[in-house]
């Protein structure tokens, strides 16, 4: 992998420094902030844009970034689509590549798209195929349905593949039965589709669940990932990353937590299908901050022997860094970055440079000040290297 080469180069530079010769520092990341991916027209329906997601692919030897989001067309158009935009310069400029329309329901590609590239073969689908899982919902919001689409030509055209789950009215009130927020992850030749589920309303206000597929066509039984058996509590918005110690990290928002609001929680598991057996831990920064709402997480090898876990939330522009593999009791550092506050920002570590964190947001939720200015924008930020007190021993 490219990041391995980068780390070996950095280690070589450190060794040279220890021998008393000049250090050749790695080039700084070419950072930026406020790059506009999409500026919706003034007549778009509020909230205009929301819920951005990104993916990096390799195409003809070049790294290409893709982005998609919720797209609120003028006059509450009954047939919204997921735009897919492309960037060939690490996110400094963008243009449209394709549009994904609802092909089977007659409702619209309305909420919560997630874009994912298969890292291995799955049934008749090949490594490199690009998937979008989304919440397909009619204009009157009377139903919710998580469908999967595939592209075999680099996200230029799309074809419906299968439906994972169907729920009721698309309103996040306890007692209703919608499904929300799909997230995909391939594990041991099974594609896992995590999502939030309100259908078990007798026992749970909302819970997080998953289903798996070995062929992308048929989906297995539902399994709980976070279920508190409380009709008021609402854990939701699952995001999963693999860590270098072989464990898997789940972040989620938790309405019902003792900290209040939609506090961000984490869970660690040896198997990404068994999070319900793991304890939940609140994310609390060293300054006492508990981030709230719509978290996202990624891991990068930069930052020390364990790398760095990075978590974003929806209530502030800062991010949270952990160099202890997110284990309970390890420190979370709140760090300012030049990014806007945004509902469920997407985080992505660039393959070309593990120091480069791409942060993409689609704007604020309805009712929040500034929602009338929602747009999709990007920030590229350099992840800090190991703390200086650790590096000093090698720079003598």
What are these model-derived regions, one by one?
Residues 1-22, 395-396:
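Fungal secretory targeting signals
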């Amino acid at each position: 992998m490219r990041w391995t080469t980068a780390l070996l180069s950095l280690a070589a530079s450190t060794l040279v420094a220890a021998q008393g010769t000049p250090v050749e520092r790695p080039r700084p990341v070419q950072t930026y902030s406020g790059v506009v991916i999409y500026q919706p027209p003034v007549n778009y329906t509020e909230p205009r844009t929301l819920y951005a997601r990104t993916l990096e692919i390799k195409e003809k030897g070049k790294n290409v970034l893709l982005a998609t989001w919720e797209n609120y067309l003028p006059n509450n158009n009954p047939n919204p689509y997921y735009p897919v935009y492309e960037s060939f310069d690490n996110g400094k400029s963008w243009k449209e590549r394709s549009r994904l329309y609802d092909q089977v329901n007659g409702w619209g590609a309305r909420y919560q798209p997630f874009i994912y590239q298969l890292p291995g073969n799955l049934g008749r689908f090949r490594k490199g195929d690009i998937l979008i899982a989304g919440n397909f919902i009619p204009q009157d919001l009377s139903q919710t349905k998580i469908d999967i689409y595939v592209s075999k030509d680099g996200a230029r055209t799309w074809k419906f593949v299968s439906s994972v789950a169907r729920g009721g009215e698309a309103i996040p009130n306890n007692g209703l039965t919608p499904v929300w927020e799909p997230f995909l992850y391939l594990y041991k030749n099974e594609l896992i589709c995590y999502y939030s589920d309100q259908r078990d309303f007798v026992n749970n206000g909302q819970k997080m669940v998953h289903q798996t597929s070995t062929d992308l066509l048929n989906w297995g039984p539902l399994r709980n990932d976070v279920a508190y058996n409380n009709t008021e509590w609402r854990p939701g918005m699952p995001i999963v990353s693999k860590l270098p110690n072989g464990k898997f990290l789940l972040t989620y928002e938790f309405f019902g937590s003792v900290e209040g609001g939609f506090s961000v929680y984490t869970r660690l598991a040896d198997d990404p299908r068994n999070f319900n057996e793991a304890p939940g831990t609140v994310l609390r920064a060293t300054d006492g901050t508990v981030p709230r709402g719509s978290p996202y997480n990624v891991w990068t090898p930069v930052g020390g022997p364990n790398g760095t876990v990075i978590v974003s939330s929806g209530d502030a522009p800062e991010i949270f860094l952990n160099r202890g593999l997110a284990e309970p009791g390890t420190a979370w550092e709140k760090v300012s970055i030049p990014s806007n506050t945004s509902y469920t920002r997407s985080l992505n570590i660039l393959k070309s440079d593990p120091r480069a964190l791409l942060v993409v947001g689609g704007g604020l939720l309805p009712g929040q000040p500034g929602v009338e200015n929602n747009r999709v924008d990007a920030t590229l930020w350099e992840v800090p290297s190991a703390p200086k007190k650790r590096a000093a021993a090698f720079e003598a």
